[in-house]
Amino acid sequence: MAQPKIPIDLILSKMAEDAGKAQARAEKAPDVLLGPLDTQIAATPYDVVYEEDRVKLKHYRPVIPTEAVLKTPLLVVYALINRETMLDLQPGRSVVQNLLKDGIDLYMVDWGYPTRKDRYLSIDDHVNGYMDNIVDFIRKEHNLPKINLMGICMGGTFCVIYSALHPEKIKNLTTTVTPTNFDTDQGLLHIWMKDVDVDRMVDAFGNMPGDMMNLGFLLLNPARLMIDKYVGFAENIGNKDFVENFVRMEKWIFDSPDVPGETFRQFVKDCYHKNLLIQSKMVVGGKRVDLKKITMPLLNFYGKYDHLVPPAACEVLTSKVGSKDTEDICLDTGHIGIYVSSRCQREFGPRIAGWLKEREEEKKESRVKKPPARKAIKKKTNAKTKASSKKSKK
């Protein structure tokens, strides 16, 4: 009789060993899971300084002396999908804290949670409405003609559109994992989206459900995102630090607002189906989005292993804009790792801060002054007012 290649006693021994480890983990689990856990996210102090409908503007409090803070503030625009809290997961793993420590005066858009009344809001409403109002608010608060702008994922696409339509208001533009070229077969998402019947989906749901989009993202890599991840959790269930980090990430992943229906419809049709943006053919608010009008400095980050927004979707942008000061940075990480991995934490935030500081020193812009003509009009108005008051006294 032939001997088995793997003796049964070896298999049984391995099973017994694994069972012993599982039992040890299970014995520790109640102490960890039922004990005090620090799973709070987005704990960095901020003030809500502007509100419009569901949209809020966060202004983070400085952590260094005011005189050391960069004069030109940075506005960060996150995607409509998921929440901006991912940039502030925990101390030591927070893009927000890193930027503050490096002297950035930081603002962040909180898109909130769309309701049924928001289903007809378009890209124009978000870019030329909410974003433009927020940019004007910050410019007025700081008495500056231009501010710095940074976009993340779909929020980065919005920032590219905004900078092309309102270049006079943006000093420096930073894009991170930002899709602009949708004519690529890299990544399953781009292949899927080309055949999505977006009209049927939006007509049926109104707003695009966040839970449905989350399921779609999980199905892009089900083995890793739906099996391996939870196997890893079970194997580390007795490790308090691991459990806390795991829960923080799960909180962010499954905090998924719906996306306004008309915005989703236009984004899928104009970008995924027709690839209009990178060709400077996309129309927003009745105006063509001409990328050549992006003449301000541009810093473009993307991840080498990003399965949602692959390098091919990001790296073309710098060759299509009108700016002569552009830089591409490809990090050895994925879509989320660029913001939360320990290695990228040491490079991502400091690189952005350093880049902005260099350009702040190169070209210092004067503060906004009221136009002389407007002053003259004001004086005439005052004169008329005084004259009319004298007549009334008589």
Residue ranges: model-predicted function:
Residues 35, 42-115:
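Short, surface-exposed "cap/lid" segments of acyl-processing enzymes
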Residues 131-132, 141-154:
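Alpha/beta-hydrolase fold nucleophile elbow
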Residues 1-18, 140, 144, 159-262:
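Alpha/beta-hydrolase-fold enzymes
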Residues 314, 319-336:
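Catalytic histidine neighborhood in serine/cysteine hydrolases
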Residues 120-141:
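Alpha/beta-hydrolase active-site loop
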Residues 307-313:
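Conserved alpha/beta-hydrolase "acid-adjacent" motif
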Residues 294, 300-302, 306:
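Short beta-strand/loop motif that positions the catalytic acidic residue
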Residues 308, 328, 332-347:
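Catalytic histidine-centered segment of alpha/beta-hydrolase-like enzymes
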